[in-house]
Amino acid sequence: MEQGSETQPGPESRVLIIMTGGTICMRRSMNGFVPAQGFLETCMAPQRPFNDGSSPSDINVIIDDEGTEQPHRSYRTPISTYQKHVRYAVLEFKELLDSSSVNADGWTHIAQTIYRNYRLFDAFVILHGTDSLAYTCSALSFMLQNLGKPVILTGSQAPMLELQNDATPNLLGSLIIAGHFMIPEVCLFFNYSLMRGNRTTKVSATDFAAFASPNLPPLATISSLKTHVSWDLVYRSINLKAFSIQTSRATGNVAPLRIFPGIKPELVEAVLRLDGLKGLVLETFGAGNAPGGPDGALTRVFADAVKRGIVIVNVTQCMTGTVSPLYEPAMLLQRAGVVPGHDMTSEAALAKLSYLLALPNLTIEDVRQQMAISLRGELTAQTSVVFAHPGTANLTSLCYAISKGSEEEVQEILKGDIGWVVNEADYSGNTPLVGPILHIRMARKLLICGLNTG
């Protein structure tokens, strides 16, 4: 056994594999690949890595809300380098789905299956199609509350019955980690890497390295020698409440909107006026930037929607990096009431927003506040600004507002930048004192905010 590793006690752990469908269980047909039942006996039992040759035994699986127990055939893996077997059973959904058809009802079905069997198994592996896998990972990470056991989702780019496939290593790796390491998170295992589920996104339609975790390193990796777990990255709930699930979701009340060059305020307004819309994930340029539109018309559209109670969350279109008000466009969005989503993926932001909007005791302001903080490790909390350009954009705006004598604009700028911009200088050394201050009240306001006259 590895020094410093964390393994579950006992010679044999129990894992429930939940088969929802997807490429991993598909077989050839006259109409191409289709999901097929009988995965355990057809795909797993004949393979030595999944079957040590010992006599299979039945273990009970709860199949409905009434607590009905049904015996399922189980097999056992050969003994691992950690001197432990993993015994597993497969529960197949009656209707196997292509993951492009998975929706909130499918997520609820998965969550309920885990909840019913939570005390009977040490861990859970969910087999799922790859198209919507990152969405399901993010959704489950919020639906499964106070999780204390591993839940690992995986799938494949090629069916297990095909000669060249990634299904076998993906499933075996998931089973080994689930059965040996106490990583109490919703994770995604693919291509020998275990990633936090709500940090993942699909990056390839064909490659075996189909998923990435752009802003967080893998929680674990498997090599020919061992499984390496980065225990310092593992998220653990500090809440002592019992495991529960939240199945009410507002998925029909949230939407994503991708900013593009030349986007018209009228188009955005139409989206924000959709019947029943409560939340919007705004996919912006770079570090959270979006065009303001002619005379700030687009920014006003966002501000008006926020005033109507719509929660708008700003995430970047970039693969890596974070939303941060380094530039004026991002700062203007933040002043309009748009919530910075930091380095959340679009999938995680949508899942989190629909989860929070469905919680009965949260106000809109509560939802806004919780969207900006980490609940399940879905974003990196920034405690301080690591890097910032000199604030020339806001400084220029302030000087311009002062020169116009617009006290209202000056107050609006100082809302977000109070305490530093009044004493900032641009690359030429110009400060707010360079331009004429037209009103005594404005001068008094700047002095109250800390203007240095020395």
Q: Regions from the language model: what does each represent?
A:
Residues 126-149, 292-301, 328:
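Short Gly/Thr/Asp-enriched flexible loops that form oxyanion-binding sites at enzyme active sites
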Residues 135-169, 173-181, 304-316:
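Short, acidic/small-residue loops that bind anionic groups at enzyme active sites
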Residues 2-3, 9-11, 269, 292-392:
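ATP/nucleoside-binding phosphotransfer catalytic cores, i.e., glycine-rich phosphate-binding loops
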Residues 405-415, 440-452:
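Ankyrin repeat structural motif
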Residues 11-12, 18, 22, 40-67, ...:
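Accessory alpha-helical/coil subdomains and C-terminal extensions
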Residues 1-116, 361:
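ATP/NTP phosphate-donor binding region
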Residues 421-422, 453:
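Ankyrin-repeat inter-repeat connecting loop/turn
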Residues 160-201, 339, 363:
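Short, glycine-/small-residue-rich phosphate/pyrophosphate-handling segment
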